[in-house]
């Protein structure tokens, strides 16, 4: 492999982390209260939420947690492709479900990159197996006799390297080392990822406060009683009312 220039990694991260923060803000700007209210209302009732502001803050945090995991996962996957492009002429794969292909020490790697270990349900995992198998077949058709290794690469976590249903599962430090030959890369990328984080987060929190206030007002107008109490029945009806079972059981 070619030695990795960490300055290039820092430059890439500094330029592209901005997109992650911009997408965070955009996800807030495009959010509608009706989408937020699809979250589990029973959970918040069980937690004894009593004020509209507290409920909206909790719903918003739950939405952002899943949204940001996806957004940052995209960033990490792109970072992995960039690093492989520098160390071993890796490239973004055109095969469905495959993110990266690279060649090292006589082995052609086809890699599906995920951000964390809890990345998919059983049907999604079966689809991954199928995508990796198909990618191996495609490479073998163009490169007869090639040594091809399908890989599930996961950007963070401590799970040990293992063979799983025909592919190699590589996690955390081992994954970053696989694409760089640098055992310390997983910690080297921490500092540039935090580039201007405080500044970006302040802009995000400002937008979040605006959305929280706006949604709280809308929620009070639509889902609170004249006394000011949350109308939980009305909220659950909005969230889950869909009765049509009689059409199927009569």
What are these model-derived regions, one by one?
Residues 13, 17-24, 80-88, 132-143:
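Hydrophobic, Leu/Ile/Phe/Ala-enriched alpha-helical segments that form helix-helix packing faces
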Residues 1-75:
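Interdomain/boundary linker segments immediately adjacent to catalytic/signaling cores
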Residues 115-180:
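Catalytic cores of nucleic-acid endonucleases
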Residues 153-250:
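Domain-level recognition of nuclease-like catalytic cores that cleave nucleotide substrates
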Residues 63-93:
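A broadly used, surface-exposed interaction patch
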Residues 84, 99-102, 106-119:
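Conserved catalytic cores of phosphodiester-cleaving nucleases, focusing on short active-site segments
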Residues 93-101, 151:
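Short, surface-exposed recognition loops or helix-turn segments adjacent to catalytic cores
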């Amino acid at each position: 492999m070619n030695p990795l220039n960490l300055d290039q990694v820092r430059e890439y991260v500094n330029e592209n982390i901005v997109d992650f923060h911009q997408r965070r803000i955009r996800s807030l700007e495009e959010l509608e209260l009706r989408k937020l209210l699809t979250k589990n209302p029973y959970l918040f009732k069980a937690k004894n939420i009593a004020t509209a502001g507290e409920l909206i803050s909790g719903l918003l945090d739950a939405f952002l947690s899943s949204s940001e995991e996806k957004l940052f996962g995209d960033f990490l996957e792109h970072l992995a492709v960039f690093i492989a492009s520098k160390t071993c002429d890796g490239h973004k794969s055109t095969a469905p479900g495959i993110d990266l292909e690279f060649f090292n020490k006589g082995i052609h790697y086809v890699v599906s990159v995920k951000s964390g270990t809890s990345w998919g349900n059983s049907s999604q995992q079966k689809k991954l197996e199928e995508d990796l198998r198909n990618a191996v077949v495609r490479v073998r058709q163009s490169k007869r006799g090639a040594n091809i290794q399908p890989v599930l690469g996961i950007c963070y976590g401590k799970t040990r390297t293992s063979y799983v249903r025909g592919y190699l599962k590589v996690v955390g430090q081992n994954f970053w080392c696989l694409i760089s030959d640098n055992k310390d890369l997983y910690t080297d990328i921490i500092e540039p990822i935090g580039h201007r984080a405080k500044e970006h987060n302040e802009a995000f929190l400002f937008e979040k406060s605006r959305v929280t206030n706006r949604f709280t007002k809308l929620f009070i107008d639509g889902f609170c009683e004249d006394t000011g109490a949350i109308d939980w029945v009305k909220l659950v009806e909005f969230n889950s009312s869909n009765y049509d079972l009689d059409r199927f059981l009569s």
